[in-house]
Each structure stands twice: as C-alpha cells, then as structure tokens.
Amino acid sequence: ISPLKNDSPEFLNAEHFAIRPNTDTALMLSLAYILITNNSYDKDFINKYTVGFDSFASYVLGKKNNAPCTPEWASNITNIPIKKITNLAEKLITKKTMISMSWSLQRASRGEQPLWMGITLACMIGQIGTAGGGFGFGYSAVNSTGDSFTKIPWKSLPQGKNNIKDFIPVARITDMLEKPGETFDYDGQKFKYPDI
C-alpha cells in the first residue's frame, strides 16, 4: 500500500494499492469498521491487552460524529476501490498479518495518527507477539531487516542511578495534568498519576 508502485520488491509479486498520499489512516479506519461490523476482530486480545476500545469503536461506527468510517467513505478519500478494501479486511484476519509502516508517514501533518491506527489495527487482528504477525515501523529504512549484523558499541557517559519512582506513558501527560491522583491502567497494571 503506497503511492509508489516500486516500494515493494518485484520478487514479492505483491498486489499494489495505489493510495493517495497521507490517507493511510482513513484506509485503516475503514478496515477497522469492517472488522467491527462483521464482528471478526479478536475480542479476547482487545479485552486483555487494550484500554478504550469501546470509545474507539463508537468513533469508527459514527456514533460520536455521525460519520462512520465505511469502505465507501475511505474509497473516496484514498482512491482505493471499495472491493479492494473489503478484500483486504478479510485477508487481515484469515492470513498471517504483519503491519509494517514506513517512518515517513509520521512526517506529515497529524503524522502520529497512522502509527497509532496501525497499532490499533494490529491489536484488532490479535497477532502481536506471534511469529510473522504484529506491527513494525521503519523496517525498510534500516537496511538490516532479516539480516544479522554486528552491533558496534557507542561511546557514552555513565548514566548514574535514576531516583525517580513515578512513571506515566508519555501519551498520558495531558491526562496526568488534568487528573492528578487518579489511577490508570497501563500494560496490565494500575498506576496513579502524580500531582506535579
């Protein structure tokens, strides 16, 4: 899936989806819409490893803004035919799926959204942590995908001991500032926002 046909090596004989640049999130939202409406996403994975899926699903289905993220909606934005979108959704859940995204996606306006959506879609598929499944970023840019290489040690200064015990995920800074002292779930554990 790329505006450029030569993004994938020819030997893969891959089907090319000529997406309009910067519309990847719309495509993935429509794939999520299909998985939700077909009730074909991995509910066990979602319930065990994620927080907030009900709110996300409500958005995708158009319950919050009366704008469901249907394949028809996405096709108009992405230039990918509806049939290709629906077929791709089917393949996501019936085949081994690795969502590999280029780092270049985050260099656009609202560039965090395709990366967040890629992870969300990978969670819905439920193959994170399985051989050949899950998600990854920037594999095409590091020139060592699938190859072993020698790590060269970098010079660095000693770091010392970190005496800070409080922890919050960086994506929750706003929540911490707005809700000091409240608890939140992260990585299967409960934490408390510090009052700073």
What are these regions (language model features)?
Residues 4-94:
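Long, well-ordered, tryptophan-enriched scaffold segments
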Residues 66, 86-98, 183-196:
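Glycine-rich phosphate/diphosphate-binding loops that line cofactor/substrate pockets in enzymes
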Residues 1, 25-29, 123-196:
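Extended redox/cofactor-interaction regions of prokaryotic respiratory oxidoreductases
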